[in-house]
């Protein structure tokens, strides 16, 4: 998070997502004395990737604090807020979802958070991933490649990145990645647990800010061609530097 001050000296803590490339979670948890705050499934996990992992547990929003506020106080409040949002959404979730625990829903919500910033698309993205999981299909979502690459990501995904088997690359692993890959908003958590009524299995960017959702690989491939055409057209209209 970032700490800002207004002209009255009031601190404003702004929590932002930096893609989670700093993985010294245990050290951070110890330094900020967060061990007693985090849930047992994280602290006591036998999976070294999950153990002490802080990703996803803090609700992204703007919070206001006065002088003397500590990092631990701020993060405790953010954690409690995320727990409240997740618990309420989980208790009111739609039936027959493929998620066994609230933590799995948090993981999915973080992926939706990274896939689209268009509010009305979140339930559709959620439906695509639910449908793929229900059918035993791999999720094949690019943000998981990027997260698994960490600091090696330089702005482009290459074929070798798609083919690399990391713990997060959902082109190479079945099901969900082991932890969240971002800080999911309440809207993404809600979309995860209330997906749209859709049979879509694929989506691709349109080149104009949104995505096109399709039910078959043939239709998806056509949508990809259309996207590439839009991008070529935009590139041709860009004046030389």
Regions inferred by a protein language model and the residue ranges of each:
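Bacterial extracytoplasmic/cell-wall-associated proteins, especially those involved in peptidoglycan
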Residues: 3-16, 20, 25-241
């Amino acid at each position: 998070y970032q700490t800002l001050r207004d002209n009255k000296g009031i601190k404003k803590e702004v929590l932002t997502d930096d893609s989670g490339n700093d993985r010294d979670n245990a050290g951070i948890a110890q330094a900020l004395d967060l061990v007693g705050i985090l849930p047992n499934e994280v602290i006591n996990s036998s999976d070294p990737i999950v153990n002490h992992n802080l990703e996803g547990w803090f609700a992204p929003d703007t919070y206001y604090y006065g002088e003397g506020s500590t990092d631990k106080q701020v993060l405790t409040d953010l954690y409690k807020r995320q727990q409240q949002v997740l618990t309420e959404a989980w208790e009111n979730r739609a039936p027959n979802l493929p998620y066994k625990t609230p933590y799995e829903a948090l993981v999915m919500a973080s992926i939706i958070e990274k896939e689209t910033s268009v509010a009305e698309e979140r339930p559709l993205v959620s439906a695509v991933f639910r449908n793929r999981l229900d059918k035993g299909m791999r999720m094949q979502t690019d943000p998981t490649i990027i997260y698994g690459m960490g600091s090696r990501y330089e702005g482009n995904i290459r074929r070798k990145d798609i083919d690399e088997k990391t713990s997060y690359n959902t082109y190479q692993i079945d099901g969900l990645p082991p932890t969240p890959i971002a800080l999911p908003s309440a809207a993404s958590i809600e979309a995860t647990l209330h997906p749209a009524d859709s049979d879509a299995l694929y989506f691709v960017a349109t080149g104009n800010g949104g995505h096109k959702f399709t039910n078959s690989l043939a239709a998806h491939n056509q949508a990809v061609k259309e996207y590439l055409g839009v991008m070529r057209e935009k590139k041709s209209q860009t004046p030389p530097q």
